[in-house]
């Protein structure tokens, strides 16, 4: 998305025609509870809302996020990451923009949003949705601070409307605001039935210890997907911010881990043991109780580790980004200073092979990854939304409230697997039949999936896939590494091929043989000449298996299409008799060929698709005239009719998006 050029007449404030102050910017199809406010929402500029508007406050807490009527807590939690890093905030909200008291102020601001591999500038006017003269969506703790509602408007413009921000994943917003990666860690044992987990297992406790280590380096969010009975005050499908973690000792010497939770609603909602005046504080010294309670700001509360693991469902952690723009590992703190990205696509009938349960898995897009040194590597597959988020047609005329069903929120279940290979010329079926060195646990309905691994130097084959075959989609493959890397797409050999030479659908194993025609030695010409047996005689065989095999034989001469030295070429295929293994080439070539690719043609490449039974064969490539010199490659592609790879690929659960809005529930 390109920034809108804010060229306005003197003394006239900018009005964004691409995202106007109207219902078309508020709603997509009136499918959310926002529809009930349709007649009451007005648009005002900050100087019409308060006397002295400012972008950022002197006190950082006064700029903290606070949720309004819009169910976009997932986005607001990600915005909190910007407050932990000034260089990230400057990246998203470029400094030096004229404010309301500046003579250069013209009524517009520019933000940057990371979209599918690029930072895109988004310019908006500063007219904001209001109810009764106050901001009705996001706001800061001090309502005369406007960086947050302006950024929210820019994000809504990217998505097409404010209503499109209703429900989402914190991880997606973190990526859009930082360009980094984000991980989602489940706090529940997925092998247990929902709602029946009374005490967390050891793995979840280790997660909390990891969070304690990460608290100063990253944004950490936590979500409630389905609150337990007795904890309904947390809401359902709601996201929170973990502001702090404190490890302390009880009066009896027992270790206690407390987590400080910030609710974007802006009010305290927790009635657990560690609420103000709760029984949990009896375990610590009164001075420590006073110290920790004094740290609480509006909308914050303390939760003990056991309560946290019982009441919350998952945490989301954003990878730290250095001032140089490099990601830092969540697991080792090492800087992933080498980055490579490449786009790709799953095309129905061509490269949408599905998961490894399908025999057409090898048809999926494939990428070469080369490591020059031992490295920690993160490889991610980011899906492009199925719709263009901007400039879409909105269904507002005569619309009535309906169940929330916003397009673009659903993504395909995708996975990623990586194989170590010895070199770039490989037998693809053989490689893919072996266990991968790294792979996702299952195909997940995430916008972006990724895996982290420690890899040794060498070549690797990375294959992203959807769970179902023939499902179209576009993606961006991103690789982050501590060591030097190279990334390239595996290209099919289609140079010079005509539409008729394309391989039929299926799995093919390819072998290439190279040779040359030399005058007086191996340039025997066509079968019209007695010197024909002097031509190169290339052996190949059709192995035993399930009957005859389809074979595509292609002869390519090594010269440019525009080269005046293009020779007429062709080839014949001879079958070796079962008892003729020791038969010399000369006597074999005096027999009639089994099949031919003639007449000889002035072409860079000629080919023939045939059905051959099990046995041994000889291919004889030739030019039409004897003593015509040149070099060539013969490619033999054999169709493999193999059974499905029994890899027992699993399908992840559908994502629960967080959106809960407290004001309307209250």
From Swiss-Prot:
Keywords: Hydrolase, Protease, Repeat, Thiol protease. GO terms for biological process: cellular response to insulin stimulus; positive regulation of D-glucose import; positive regulation of insulin secretion; positive regulation of intracellular transport; positive regulation of type B pancreatic cell apoptotic process; proteolysis; regulation of actin cytoskeleton organization; type B pancreatic cell apoptotic process. Its EC number is 3.4.22.-. The keyword Hydrolase applies. Residues 507-648 are annotated as: Domain III 2. Signal peptide: none annotated. GO terms for molecular function: calcium-dependent cysteine-type endopeptidase activity. InterPro entries: C2_III (IPR033883), Calpain_cysteine_protease (IPR022684), Calpain_domain_III (IPR022682), Calpain_III (IPR022683), Calpain_III_sf (IPR036213), Papain-like_cys_pep_sf (IPR038765), Pept_cys_AS (IPR000169), Peptidase_C2_calpain_cat (IPR001300). It comes from the Eukaryota. Residues 322-488 are annotated as: Domain III 1. The active site is at 73, 238, 263. One of its GO terms (cellular component) is cytosol. PROSITE patterns: CALPAIN_CAT (PS50203), THIOL_PROTEASE_CYS (PS00139). Residues 13-321 form the Calpain catalytic domain. Calcium-regulated non-lysosomal thiol-protease which catalyzes limited proteolysis of substrates involved in cytoskeletal remodeling and signal transduction. May play a role in insulin-stimulated glucose uptake. PANTHER family: CALPAIN (PTHR10183), CALPAIN-10 (PTHR10183:SF30). Belongs to the peptidase C2 family. This is Calpain-10. It comes from Mus musculus. The gene is Capn10.
């Amino acid at each position: 998305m390109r920034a809108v050029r804010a060229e306005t007449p003197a003394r006239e404030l900018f009005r964004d025609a691409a995202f106007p102050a109207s219902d078309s910017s508020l709603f997509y199809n009136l499918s959310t509870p926002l529809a009930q406010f349709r007649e009451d929402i007005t648009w005002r500029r900050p100087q019409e809302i308060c006397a002295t508007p400012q972008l950022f406050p002197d006190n950082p807490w006064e700029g903290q996020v606070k949720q309004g009527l819009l169910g976009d807590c997932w986005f607001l939690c990600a915005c909190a990451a910007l407050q932990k890093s000034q260089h990230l905030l400057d990246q998203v909200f470029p400094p030096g923009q004229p404010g309301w008291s500046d003579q250069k102020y013209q009524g517009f601001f520019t933000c940057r949003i990371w979209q599918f591999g690029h930072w895109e500038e988004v310019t908006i006017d500063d007219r904001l949705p209001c109810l009764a003269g106050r901001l009705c969506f996001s706001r800061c703790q001090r309502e005369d601070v406007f960086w947050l509602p302006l950024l929210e408007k820019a994000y809504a413009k990217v998505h097409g409307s404010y209503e499109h921000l209703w429900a989402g994943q914190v991880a997606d917003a973190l990526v859009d605001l930082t360009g980094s990666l984000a991980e989602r860690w489940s706090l529940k044992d997925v092998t247990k039935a929902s709602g029946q987990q009374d005490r967390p297992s050891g793995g979840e406790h280790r997660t909390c210890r990891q969070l304690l280590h990460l608290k100063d380096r990253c944004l950490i969010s936590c979500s409630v997907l389905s609150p337990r009975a007795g904890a309904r005050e947390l809401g359902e499908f709601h996201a929170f911010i973990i502001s702090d973690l404190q490890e302390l000792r009880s009066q009896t010497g027992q270790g206690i881990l407390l987590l400080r939770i910030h609710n974007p609603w802006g009010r305290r909602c927790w009635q657990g043991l560690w609420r103000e005046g709760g029984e949990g504080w009896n375990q610590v010294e009164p001075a420590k109780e006073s110290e920790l309670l004094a740290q609480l700001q509006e909308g914050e509360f303390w939760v003990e580790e056991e309560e946290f693991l019982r009441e919350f469902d998952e945490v989301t952690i954003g990878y730290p980004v250095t001032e140089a723009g490099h990601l830092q590992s969540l697991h080792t703190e090492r800087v992933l200073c080498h980055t490579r990205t490449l786009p790709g696509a799953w095309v129905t009938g061509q490269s949408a092979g599905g998961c490894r349960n399908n025999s057409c898995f090898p048809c999926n897009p494939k990428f070469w990854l080369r490591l020059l040194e031992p490295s920690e590597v993160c490889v991610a597959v980011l899906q492009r939304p199925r719709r263009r988020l901007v400039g879409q047609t909105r269904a507002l005329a005569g619309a009535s409230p309906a169940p929330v069903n916003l397009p673009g929120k659903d993504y395909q279940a995708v996975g990623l697997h990586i194989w170590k290979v010895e070199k770039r010329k490989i037998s693809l079926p053989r490689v893919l039949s072996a266990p991968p060195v790294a792979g996702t646990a299952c195909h997940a309905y995430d916008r972006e999936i990724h895996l982290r691994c420690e890899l040794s130097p060498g070549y690797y084959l990375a294959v992203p896939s959807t769970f179902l075959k023939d499902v179209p989609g576009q993606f961006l493959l991103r690789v982050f590494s501590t060591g030097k890397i190279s990334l390239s797409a595996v290209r099919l050999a289609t140079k010079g091929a005509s539409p008729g030479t394309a391989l039929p659908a299926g799995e093919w194993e390819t072998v290439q043989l190279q040779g040359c025609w030399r005058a007086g030695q191996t340039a025997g010409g066509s079968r019209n000449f007695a010197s024909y047996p002097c031509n190169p005689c290339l052996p190949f065989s059709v192995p035993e298996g399930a009957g005859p095999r389809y074979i595509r034989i292609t002869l390519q001469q090594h010269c440019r299409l525009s080269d005046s030295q293009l020779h007429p070429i062709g080839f014949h295929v001879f079958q070796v008799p079962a008892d003729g293994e020791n038969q010399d080439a000369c006597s074999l070539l005096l027999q009639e060929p089994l099949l031919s690719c003639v007449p000889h043609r002035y072409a860079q490449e000629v080919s023939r698709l045939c059905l051959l039974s099990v046995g041994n064969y000889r291919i004889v490539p030739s030019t039409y005239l004897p003593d015509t010199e040149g070099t060539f490659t013969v490619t033999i592609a054999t169709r493999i009719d193999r059974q499905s790879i029994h890899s027992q690929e699993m399908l992840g659960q559908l994502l629960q998006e967080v959106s809960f809005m407290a004001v309307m529930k209250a």
